[in-house]
From Swiss-Prot:
The gene is sdsB. The lineage of its organism: Bacteria, Pseudomonadati, Pseudomonadota. Residues 19-38 bind DNA. InterPro entries: HTH-type_LysR_regulators (IPR050950), LysR_subst-bd (IPR005119), Tscrpt_reg_HTH_LysR (IPR000847), WH-like_DNA-bd_sf (IPR036388), WH_DNA-bd_sf (IPR036390). One of its GO terms (cellular component) is cytosol. Belongs to the LysR transcriptional regulatory family. It comes from Pseudomonas sp. (strain ATCC 19151). Pfam families: HTH_1, LysR_substrate. Keywords: Activator, DNA-binding, Transcription, Transcription regulation. The keyword Transcription regulation applies. Residues 1-59 form the HTH lysR-type domain. One of its GO terms (molecular function) is DNA-binding transcription factor activity. Activates the transcription of the sdsA gene for sodium dodecyl sulfate (SDS) degradation. The keyword Ribonucleoprotein does not apply. Coiled coil: none annotated. This is SDS degradation transcriptional activation protein.
Length: 306
């Protein structure tokens, strides 16, 4: 029976592609790592690697073993985390995900409170698109995530808890040329002279933006790092769109400004939700984090967001 140490060594070698780097990653000497891999190959009765002068590559057997090894190691980590958390939250692990917008305000606030209450729990936070987070949840790489749930609500594999909805806005830097046009609300033609930046959006929102694009304003810059988008807007004439909650504090402080749009030009609202696997019991850490996210979501927003 091959033990998990050999599988960890094999996964490290597959990921690094080089014995020296893999040995360093798992704190072994190169000869010891080589012996471990050979023992794994002997135990399975097949060759897992093609050894080249500069790097190693996986055989067909190696690719199959890698897929199963990752699942076994994930299961081992989940088991150890669950056992350590059974009686308290003094240790263990929480693997959490967030979309670009909830990852900019809601989740960090809840996570700060969680870390203060449970400093012994190791947290891995992934900021990604709703699509990628969905896949990672189904692969058991995440236990819980917060993201746009428009395209996830009807998935029977998921448990989705809707969160507060925020109006969508288009924002710019203070002093932007469009802010001087206070005599009328801005139309698509007014916006067309400036690039519009935003994150990857669900189909429903993309359709609405497509209607805007037909009037001359496409989504010219796509970036899933909202902090980068805000910095881009602050330093240029680029416009960006977001739910109001993630820019409300900057608007209130005068670091960003909202554009007043013509009625119906941007009617979309946020659709955040808490997502976990249906029929799965959350770990104590994930359950505690879920409660903090719900509590933070219910708190009074900044004045400019009311």
């Amino acid at each position: 029976m091959n033990d998990l140490r050999q599988l960890r060594h094999f996964v490290a070698l597959a990921e690094h592609g080089h014995f020296a780097r893999a040995a360093e990653a798992v704190n072994l000497s190169q000869p010891a790592l080589s012996r471990s891999i050979q023992a794994l190959e002997n135990g399975l009765g097949c060759r897992l690697l093609d050894r080249g002068p500069r790097q190693v590559s996986l055989t067909a057997h190696g690719r199959l073993v890698l897929e199963h090894a990752r699942r076994l190691l994930d299961g081992d980590r989940a088991l150890r985390s669950a056992v350590s958390q059974l009686d308290n939250l003094g240790s263990g692990e929480l693997r959490l995900g967030a979309g670009p917008y909830p990852g900019a305000r809601l989740v960090p606030r809840a996570l700060g409170r969680f870390a203060g209450a449970h400093p012994g729990v190791r947290v891995q936070l992934a900021i990604d698109t709703w699509y990628s987070l969905h896949q990672r949840l189904l692969d058991d790489a995440l236990e819980l995530f917060v993201a746009d749930v428009r395209e996830l609500r009807d998935d029977p594999q998921l448990e989705v808890t809707p969160l507060r909805s925020w109006p969508g806005v288009i924002f710019c830097r203070p002093g932007h040329p469009l802010l001087g046009r206070r005599r009328h609300r801005l139309t698509a033609a007014d916006l067309a002279a400036y690039p519009l930046a935003g994150t990857q959006v669900p189909a429903e929102v993309a359709q609405a933006l497509g209607q805007l694009a037909e009037s001359g304003q496409p989504l010219g810059i796509e970036c899933d790092n909202f902090m980068a988008l805000k910095a881009l807007v602050a330093e240029s004439d680029v416009l960006s769109m977001a739910p109001l909650d993630v820019v409300a504090e900057e608007i209130e402080a005068g670091r960003l400004a909202l554009l007043e749009l013509a009625p119906g030009l941007l009617s979309q609202r946020s659709a955040y939700g808490l997502v976990s696997r249906a029929g799965r019991t959350l770990s104590p850490a994930a359950e505690a984090m879920r409660g903090l996210i719900l509590d933070e979501d219910a708190r009074t927003p900044p004045a400019s967001a009311r």
